[in-house]
Swiss-Prot record:
Organism: Danio rerio
Residues binding RNA, per UniProt: 429-431, 435, 445-446, 475, 499, 504
Name of this protein: YTH domain-containing family protein 2
Compartments, as annotated in UniProt: Cytoplasm, Cytosol; Cytoplasm, P-body; Cytoplasm, Stress granule; Nucleus
InterPro entries the record matches: YTH_domain, YTH_prot
Length: 613
């Protein structure tokens, strides 16, 4: 083995005795001559300097080796003041820079008194080794005390053989070289939040280092980073996921307990858009705390068509069969001094709004009859008491006109013959329920000019051989309101003068048999072959129904157990008729009935509400 090959295998940093020249034959040595140097002095420093220089021994690294292995050294806890940042540059035995106190000025030349070996710089004395103490204090307290200076002047532990200068805690023995300066302090702090101080003890420098020469110790810490990196990454992921875990628990407790803030919005959102919500009911009900005056008033305030009450809040029938005026008819009336708007919401909240979802698209009767326009209609037993209705004028007894009509006529008979052998049946479409009320009251009817001719011809054709039944329905109401029998031919020269519109001419007598509200859903399955096979509910005025289909319709109407009828609103329509008559008296005195804008809008509103939507 040549000397040049031996020089290449020497540890890094050892000086070559033959510099700047070729190796001659006389300089060649045997292998066994280097054994004492390679085996006996592995720990000595290789930086030899001339002893004649009084400054060099103390200024640079000491020329003597350490007398103990570095794996016995305690990791500095930073108990000493962070002095190394005031030191000047020097070099350790492995060739890396470090900071040491300047021994040139104000320091003794003896190496025994040099801070390099006095525990101030390295704390190399094995006495007081306490690894668990490092885990408790370094990760939580000491890293914050010395990180102000030590993190800026510390170097990788691989360059110091696993030792730390002046208790600088930011670097561990397994610190990767590519990690930013000071990141170890952050890792230790975050890891301490997760696994505590007891699990940090295995990361102490001395635990994973072999007890060998300095050159071997310096390479040992380079292996653990590969295995320790996943553990740190896992701790970061666990810590990041911790804040998200309590969130579902808080929501669950809030929904079950009902005492936190989330339940009120949930309860509020459940009420919004549902028909059981009574929060919006008092708004239209407040102005109805008054009775209708009987003196003359503008028609636009008092007598709109029944369709004008679609937006109003219907009321349930009272126990005595009478109903209070609907809200849609009394919105413009002033509130009397004795009215109590606050008493209305409890009464309105008791009504079951069964069919309200479909009301905005069709005509709605003015009272609580709207609750019965469905297959699952509520019974009259659901009507609220009238004790809390405030200033509403409620008749104590049924209307006298209605009582007289019921005594004279046997409405809704149980022994009705719905299967006549001969007869004819026609559909009657009314523009308003006001006209239905007056037809029941006066037992008369009048259709259009074309309708009168058709009905008159049909009546005469029967020649009393069979009945002629009329199935009444208000345009857009969604139900049939009754059945009447035509009892006389049409008198074209007579004008009744009782209809809500004065454009009707002619009159014929009728007798009302059934007065009940039957929903279209009960009759929609019956189709008419003489009307393009359309349902009987989709018919025009004076549309004739074939006798076989008419028997089905009459049977359903006769057997249907109704819950509402126009009788529930009879008092209401009586008041409307009185108001219209008072308006007509003013017109007779010489004023143009259409000169007043309010009167004109009133009649237009009636026409609009009477049309089929």
């Amino acid at each position: 083995m040549s000397a040049s090959s031996l020089l290449e295998q020497r540890p890094k940093g050892q000086a070559n005795k033959v510099q700047n020249g070729a190796v001659t034959q006389k300089d060649t040595l045997n292998d066994d001559e280097f054994e004492p140097y390679l085996n006996a002095q592995p720990r000595q420093s290789n930086a030899y300097t001339a002893m004649s220089d009084s400054y060099m021994p103390s200024y640079y690294s000491p020329s003597i080796g350490f007398t103990y292995s570095l794996n016995e050294a305690a990791w500095s806890t930073g108990g000493d003041p962070p002095m190394p940042y005031l030191a000047s540059y020097g070099q350790l035995s492995n060739g890396e820079h470090h900071f040491l106190p300047d021994a040139m000025f104000g320091q003794s030349g003896a190496l025994g008194n040099n801070p390099f070996l006095g525990q101030h710089g390295f704390n190399f004395f094995p006495s007081g080794i306490d690894f668990p103490a490092w885990g408790n204090s370094s990760s939580q307290g000491q890293s914050t005390q010395s990180s102000g200076y030590s993190s800026s002047y510390a170097y990788a532990p691989s360059t110091l053989g696993g030792a730390m200068i002046d208790g600088q805690s930011p670097f561990a023995a397994n610190e990767p070289l590519n990690k930013a300066v000071g990141m170890n302090s952050l890792d230790q702090g975050m890891a301490g939040l997760k696994i505590g101080a007891g699990d940090m003890a295995p990361k102490v420098v001395g635990s994973g280092l072999p007890g060998g020469p300095l050159s071997q110790v310096s390479t040992a810490p380079t292996m653990p980073p590969a295995s320790m990196a996943p553990a740190k990454t896992a701790s970061w992921a666990d810590i990041a996921s911790k804040p998200a875990k309590p969130q579902p628990k808080l929501k669950t407790k809030g929904g079950l307990g009902g005492t936190n803030l989330p339940p009120p919005p949930i309860k509020h959102n459940m009420d919004i858009g549902t028909w059981d919500n009574k929060g919006n009911m008092p708004k239209p009900a407040a102005p109805q705390q008054t009775s209708l005056p009987t003196n003359g008033q503008p028609p636009n305030q008092s007598s709109p068509q029944p369709g004008a009450t679609a937006g109003g809040v219907p009321q349930l029938p009272l126990s005595n069969g009478q109903l209070v005026p609907p809200t849609g008819q009394l919105v413009q009336h002033p509130l009397p001094p004795g009215g109590q708007p606050g008493a209305v919401p409890p009464q309105l909240s008791q009504g079951p709004p069964a069919s309200q979802p479909s009301q905005p698209t069709r005509w709605v009767p003015p009272r609580n009859r709207a609750n019965g326009f469905g297959d699952a209609a509520g019974g009259p037993g659901q009507s609220p008491p009238n004790s809390g209705m405030g200033g509403i004028t409620v008749p104590a007894e049924p209307h006298p006109v209605l009582e007289k009509l019921r005594m004279v006529n046997n409405y809704n008979p149980k022994d009705f013959d719905w299967n006549p052998k001969h007869g004819r049946v026609f559909i009657i479409k009314s523009y308003s329920e006001d006209d239905i009320h007056r037809s029941i009251k006066y037992n008369i009817w009048c259709s259009t000019e074309h309708g009168n001719k058709r009905l008159d011809a049909a009546y005469r054709s029967l020649a009393n051989k069979g009945p002629l039944y009329l199935l009444f329905s208000v345009n857009g109401s969604g139900h049939f309101c009754g059945v009447a029998e035509m009892r006389s031919p049409v008198d074209y020269n007579t004008c009744a003068g009782v209809w809500s519109q004065d454009k009707w001419k002619g009159r014929f007598d009728v007798r009302w048999i059934f007065v009940k509200d039957v929903p279209n859903s009960q009759l929609r399955h019956i189709r008419l072959e003489n009307n393009e096979n359309k349902p009987v509910t989709n018919s025009r005025d004076t549309q004739e129904v074939p006798l076989d289909k008419a028997r089905q319709v009459l049977k359903i109407i006769a057997s249907y157990k109704h819950t509402t009828s126009i009788f529930d609103d009879f008092s209401h329509y009586e008041k409307r008729q009185e108001e219209e008559e008072s308006v007509k008296k003013v017109e007779v005195q010489g004023s143009d009935p259409y000169s007043n804008n309010s009167s004109r809008s009133h009649y237009r509103m009636q026409d609009r509400q009477g049309r089929v939507k």
